[in-house]
């Protein structure tokens, strides 16, 4: 009898134990606490068009299982005699349940449940580069491939909403939409001036610059008031003030040199920059030295505090949704606190996977998307510091 009462007490205590929000299994009365599935989607070829770093398709890894290979989603087939198109960008819409891939010739969307292509567009044939989604997941801002214009696109259908000319920013290349969804930051490979568009009117509202060199990868703070930009011929970064439109800081990496002869990709020493979610750190690539440098962003100018060796030349960085990891284009997974490499991406054949086009997606136990991250490593502090 005592054993029965003890067992009954245990059952009652378990029933009263709270389950973390969002982790409760749905349907059939199940009450098990389940961890959301945390998957990293990596589009290849994402180091130019070299299929030696992961082949062709979208390679998926499980972050909860030390980034073990899960599957490969087919994208395009190419005859052996034709070089594949290098992937230029990747993004995920939570409400539409779609993943988007851009190449040097097209933009396409796949349903993440069926893994089937939903639509594909080439627009005027001058498509495409690294795009961005508005926070509501409904509109894509897509750079043309090197032209002085961006496409504003309906994310559900691929329909062109507007072809926006950017006379101050040529060589359309990289795009970020602010966390509040009001601004699209437009950087061109052939320009020292960045344009900013008002997403409510789809018109250019201001410019920032002149930067010291043509603007390469960049990121912004969560308030959308500061731009952290790589530029040509600088092992480091510059900071642009959105309010004044001026460049306010130039930060160079100390203790490391570079030369063009030591660069095999992109032609600039730093091609990749990301803010930590709390905006206390800036992480910067150094392709010439196969290194990632970390800066303290709580002081101005930011101070270099740590350097981490990569297995190859890094050309892109972004953060995990939980702030635990930094993803390098080399396929190195970096523990953001310990600042050490804790895993390396390999595909189903054991081949190294390297790509500048990766995005993390978290799924509820029922398979619906819970959250995703932007490929640009945007700061997540929404209010500007006093």
Positions of PLM-derived features:
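Signal peptide processing junction and immediate N-terminal pro/mature segment
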Residues: 19-26
């Amino acid at each position: 009898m005592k054993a029965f009462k003890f067992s009954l007490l245990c059952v009652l205590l378990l029933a009263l134990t709270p389950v973390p929000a969002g982790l409760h299994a749905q349907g059939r009365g199940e009450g098990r606490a389940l961890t959301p599935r945390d998957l990293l989607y990596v589009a290849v070829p994402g180091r130019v068009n070299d299929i030696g770093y992961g082949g062709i398709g979208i390679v998926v890894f499980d972050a909860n299982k030390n980034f073990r290979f899960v599957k490969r989603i087919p994208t395009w087939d190419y005859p052996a005699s034709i070089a594949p198109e290098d992937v230029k960008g990747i993004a995920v819409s939570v409400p539409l349940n779609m993943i988007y891939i851009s190449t040097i010739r097209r933009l396409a969307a796949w349903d993440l449940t069926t893994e089937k292509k939903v639509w594909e567009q080439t627009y005027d044939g001058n498509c495409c580069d690294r795009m961005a989604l508005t926070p509501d997941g409904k509109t894509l801002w897509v750079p043309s491939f090197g032209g002085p214009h961006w496409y504003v696109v309906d994310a559900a259908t691929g329909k062109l909403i507007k072809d926006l000319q950017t006379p101050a920013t040529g060589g359309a290349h990289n795009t970020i939409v602010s966390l509040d969804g009001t601004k699209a930051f437009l950087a061109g490979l052939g320009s020292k001036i960045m344009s900013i568009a008002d997403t409510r009117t789809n018109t250019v509202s201001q410019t920032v610059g002149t930067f010291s060199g043509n603007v390469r990868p960049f990121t912004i703070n969560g308030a959308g008031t500061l731009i952290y930009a790589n530029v040509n011929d600088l092992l480091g970064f510059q900071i642009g003030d959105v309010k004044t439109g001026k460049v306010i800081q130039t930060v160079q990496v100390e203790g490391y040199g570079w030369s063009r002869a030591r660069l095999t990709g992109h032609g600039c020493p730093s091609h990749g920059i990301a803010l930590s979610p709390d905006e206390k750190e800036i992480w910067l690539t150094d392709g010439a030295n196969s290194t990632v440098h970390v800066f303290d962003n709580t002081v101005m100018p930011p101070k270099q505090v740590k350097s981490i060796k990569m297995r190859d030349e890094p050309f892109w960085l972004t953060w995990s949704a939980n702030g635990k990891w930094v993803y390098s284009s080399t396929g190195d997974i970096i523990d953001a606190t310990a600042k050490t490499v804790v895993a390396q991406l390999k595909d189903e054949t054991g081949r190294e996977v390297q790509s500048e086009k990766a995005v993390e997606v978290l799924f509820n136990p029922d398979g619906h998307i819970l959250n995703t991250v932007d490929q640009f490593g945007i700061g997540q502090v929404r209010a500007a510091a006093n």
